[in-house]
UniProtKB/Swiss-Prot annotation:
Stored InterPro entries: Bact_Chemotaxis_MeTrfase, CheR_C, CheR_MeTrfase, CheR_N, CheR_N_sf, SAM-dependent_MTases_sf
First-level EC class: transferase
Biological processes, Gene Ontology terms: methylation
Purpose of the protein: Methylation of the membrane-bound methyl-accepting chemotaxis proteins (MCP) to form gamma-glutamyl methyl ester residues in MCP.
Protein name: Chemotaxis protein methyltransferase
UniProt keywords, alphabetically: Methyltransferase, S-adenosyl-L-methionine, Transferase
Gene that this sequence comes from: cheR
Biological classification of the source: Bacteria, Pseudomonadati, Pseudomonadota, Gammaproteobacteria, Vibrionales
SUPFAM superfamilies: Chemotaxis receptor methyltransferase CheR, N-terminal domain, S-adenosyl-L-methionine-dependent methyltransferases
Source organism of this protein record: Vibrio parahaemolyticus serotype O3:K6 (strain RIMD 2210633)
Length: 275
């Protein structure tokens, strides 16, 4: 039977490795998460134990194993239209405001996970175009993630009933999805055409991505150290067009991390505008 226990030292070494690779800080008591996320890789890579896997990952003996381990640790389930208010604010305030500039609107969904956020943004855009014909110029969404397997899933746009049931109304399911067989549904092409998925580690430079009008970076910063949070936020400030907006998760704040944004209360919810 494969051993799935790990020592405190192995956990500390792997934690340091993970933070160096993608900024995620595990803390002192997430051994259970490492075991649950990485145990399947022990069998996949034909290793004797989880300890062997962690040692190989930290030592850099197998690049494919390293990538798979980071991939497993950064994969998170998410919801459609999470918290609702960001998408209401997008439709009622941000899109009309940015559209007044009479140029293409560019939106970035950072750490897009399994695709629910960027596709929710795309659906919001299509609903806005239908409700207010002629309001919006061309709109494009860039969705990024560090996980190659998540990006592959996003591009396919196929979801099972469990995933579809997390925040997606029956009306939107009928409007924006088509049957994919085996109880699954696929995002329609008119939604997918709005989104370009690409790999991006938030620790790296964003300069080659260009400038955006709106950035969604929701429920991501909570995994980072204060130093990493500041780095990400300041880079995102540099990636916004003048007057651009940043949307964070409901429990996230900029306090003490950057002075490049001003808070905008939207009732409900808070967003941030580039100074």
């Amino acid at each position: 039977m494969t051993a799935i226990t790990i020592s405190d030292q192995e956990y500390r070494d792997f934690s340091r490795f993970l933070e160096s690779q993608c900024g995620i800080v595990l803390g002192d008591s997430k051994q259970y998460l490492v075991r649950s996320r990485l145990s399947p890789l022990v069998t996949k890579f034909k290793l004797a134990s989880l300890s062997d896997l962690l040692r190989d990952v930290v030592a850099g003996r197998n690049r494919e194993l390293r990538i798979a381990a980071v991939d497993a640790m950064t994969t998170n389930e998410t919801l459609w239209f999470r918290d609702t208010y960001p998408f209401t604010v997008l439709a009622d305030k941000l899109l009309p405001e940015v559209a007044a500039n009479k140029r293409p609107i560019k939106i970035w969904s950072a750490a897009s996970s399994s695709g629910q956020e960027p596709y929710s943004i795309a659906m919001t855009i299509l609903e806005t175009q239908q409700r207010k014909p002629g309001l919006l110029p061309s709109v494009s969404i860039t969705a990024t993630d560090i996980s190659a397997s998540m990006l592959e899933m996003c591009r396919a746009g196929v979801y099972d009933n469990l995933a579809l049931g997390r925040g997606l109304s029956p009306e939107r399911r009928r409007t924006f999805f088509e049957d994919a067989g085996d109880g699954r549904m696929k995002v329609k092409d008119n939604v997918k055409r709005l989104v370009n998925f690409r790999p991006q580690n938030l620790m790296d430079s964003y300069a080659l991505m260009g400038k955006f009008d709106i950035i969604f970076c929701r429920n991501v910063l909570i995994y980072f150290s204060p130093e990493m949070k500041s780095k990400v936020l300041n880079q995102m400030a540099s990636s916004l067009n003048p007057g651009g907006y940043l949307l964070l998760g409901a429990s996230e704040s900029l306090t003490g991390l950057t002075d490049k944004f001003e808070m905008v209360r939207c009732n409900p919810g808070i967003i941030y505008k580039l100074k």
